[in-house]
Swiss-Prot record:
Originating organism: Ectopseudomonas mendocina (strain ymp) (Pseudomonas mendocina)
Keywords: Cytoplasm, Decarboxylase, Lyase, Porphyrin biosynthesis
Site (Transition state stabilizer): 78
GO term, biological process aspect, one: protoporphyrinogen IX biosynthetic process from glutamate
Subunit structure of this chain's protein: Homodimer.
GO CC field: cytosol
Domain of life: Bacteria
PROSITE patterns xref list: UROD_1 (PS00906), UROD_2 (PS00907)
Record function comment: Catalyzes the decarboxylation of four acetate groups of uroporphyrinogen-III to yield coproporphyrinogen-III.
Official protein name in the record: Uroporphyrinogen decarboxylase
Pathway, per record: Porphyrin-containing compound metabolism; protoporphyrin-IX biosynthesis; coproporphyrinogen-III from 5-aminolevulinate: step 4/4
UniProt keyword annotation of Cytoplasm present: yes
Length: 355
C-alpha cells in the first residue's frame, strides 16, 4: 500500500506528537455539499449511492478536494448495512428516516438471523473501501465504521427510527435473554465487518453508539458498553505495519467516560454536552479524545465559529491526543464556506498548543 503523506490523525489517536490538531468531521461527505447532492441525484437515491463503490468513493473524496485541511477521509456508508445484510430489508421513507421491511420481535426471530460474511454479503462496502484507498493514494488515512450492537438493535426491534425506543427497552427489561442474544449476534457481525474493512484498507475504525445515551447507567454497561468491549477485543489491531486505532463514540455518554476509557479503544468521541478539559482530566493518559463542537455553531458567522474553536482548543490544552471534530454530524443546511472556516481555524489556532 502507498505510504501515508499525512498521518497526523493516526498520530493524534496514538497520542504521538503532531504539528497541529488534526480535523475531520462526522458526515463530512453529505447533503451540505452541492457536489454530494449532484452525485446522489445521479445515483437515484441514498441506498443506490451507498451500494455503488465508485460513487461511494466519489462522495468520500469530494470534501477532501474542497477542503485541503481535512486530515482523514471516512467511508461513505450507513450504520444499517449489517441489519440489511441480515435480511431486514432497509429502505428510506422521505422525511421518515430509515425503515426495515421486517422487525425483530422474538428469540425465534433473532435465532434465525445470519451473521453476514463481509465479502459475500457486504462486498459493496469492502469494494468501496478498496476503491477509496486506491484513489486516496496515501493522501490521508481512511476511517471505517459500524454502528454499535445496541444502536443497531434499536433499529431492528423498532423497525426503524424511534424517539422513545419503547419496543427495544421493553425487550431489554422483559426479555433480557432475547436482547442479549441479539446483541451477541450483532457483536459477532460488527467484529467481522470491521475486520473486513481493515483488511480492505481502513486505517482506523469508529463504532457509532448513537443511542447508548438513551440507556440508564446500569443498562448502558450491560447492554451497550460490554458488547463494544467484546468487539474491540476481537479487532485486528495491526495491519500494513501500523496500529489500527479504534474510536468509541456514545452520543450522550459523557457520564461514563471512565468505564469507556477501560474498553481497550484508543480514543473516545465526545458530544458537545461534555467539557473536553474535564473529560481529559477524567480519562488521563488512557485514551485520546475526539470532538466536540456543537454542530449548530456552523450556522453562526465565521468569527463566532473561530471563537468556539479557540475555546475548545484552550479547554483541551497543550499536547497531542486530541482529534478535532463536531459533537455529532454536520447538518444539511450549513453553508459550505462555514465548514471551511471551521477547518482553517482548527489548524491555524492549534499550532501554538503543539510547540
Amino acid at each position: 500500500m502507498t505510504a501515508l503523506k499525512n498521518d497526523r490523525f493516526l498520530r493524534a489517536l496514538l497520542k504521538q506528537p503532531v504539528d497541529v490538531t488534526p480535523i475531520w468531521m462526522m458526515r463530512q461527505a453529505g447533503r451540505y455539499l452541492p457536489e454530494y447532492r449532484a452525485t446522489r441525484a445521479k445515483a437515484g437515491d441514498f441506498v443506490s449511492l451507498m451500494k455503488n463503490p465508485e460513487l461511494a468513493c466519489e462522495v468520500t473524496i469530494q470534501p477532501l478536494d474542497r477542503y485541503p485541511q481535512l486530515d482523514a477521509a471516512i467511508l461513505f456508508s450507513d450504520i444499517l448495512t449489517i441489519p440489511d445484510a441480515m435480511g431486514q430489508g432497509l429502505y428510506f421513507e422521505t422525511g421518515e428516516g430509515p425503515r426495515f421491511k421486517k422487525a425483530v420481535g422474538s428469540l425465534a426471530d433473532i435465532e434465525a438471523l445470519p451473521v453476514p460474511d463481509p465479502e459475500k454479503d457486504l462486498g459493496y462496502v469492502m469494494d468501496a473501501v478498496r476503491t477509496i484507498r486506491r484513489e486516496l493514494n496515501g493522501r490521508v488515512p481512511l476511517i471505517g465504521f459500524s454502528g454499535s450492537p445496541w444502536t443497531l438493535a434499536t433499529y431492528m426491534v423498532e423497525g426503524g427510527s424511534s424517539k422513545d425506543f419503547r419496543k427495544s427497552k421493553a425487550m431489554l427489561y422483559d426479555n433480557p435473554q432475547a436482547m442479549h442474544a441479539l446483541l451477541d449476534k450483532l457483536a459477532q457481525s460488527v467484529t467481522a465487518y470491521l475486520n473486513g474493512q481493515i483488511l480492505a484498507g481502513a486505517q482506523a475504525v469508529q463504532i457509532f453508539d448513537s443511542w447508548g445515551g438513551a440507556l440508564s447507567a446500569a443498562a448502558y454497561q450491560e447492554f451497550s458498553l460490554a458488547y463494544m468491549k467484546k468487539i474491540v477485543d476481537g479487532l485486528i489491531r495491526e495491519h500494513d505495519g501500523r496500529r489500527v486505532p479504534v474510536i468509541l463514540f456514545t452520543k450522550g455518554g459523557g457520564l461514563w467516560l471512565e468505564s469507556m476509557a477501560d474498553s481497550g479503544a484508543e480514543a473516545l468521541g465526545l458530544d458537545w454536552t461534555c467539557d473536553i478539559g474535564s473529560a481529559r482530566a477524567r480519562v488521563g493518559s488512557k485514551v485520546a479524545l475526539q470532538g466536540n463542537m456543537d454542530p449548530a455553531v456552523l450556522y453562526a458567522k465565521p468569527a463566532a465559529i473561530r471563537a468556539e474553536v479557540a475555546r475548545i482548543l484552550a479547554a483541551y490544552g497543550a499536547g497531542s491526543g486530541h482529534v478535532f471534530n463536531l459533537g455529532h454530524g454536520i447538518t444539511p443546511e450549513v453553508d459550505p464556506a462555514h465548514a471551511g472556516a471551521f477547518f482553517e481555524a482548527v489548524h491555524e489556532l492549534s499550532a501554538a498548543y503543539h510547540r
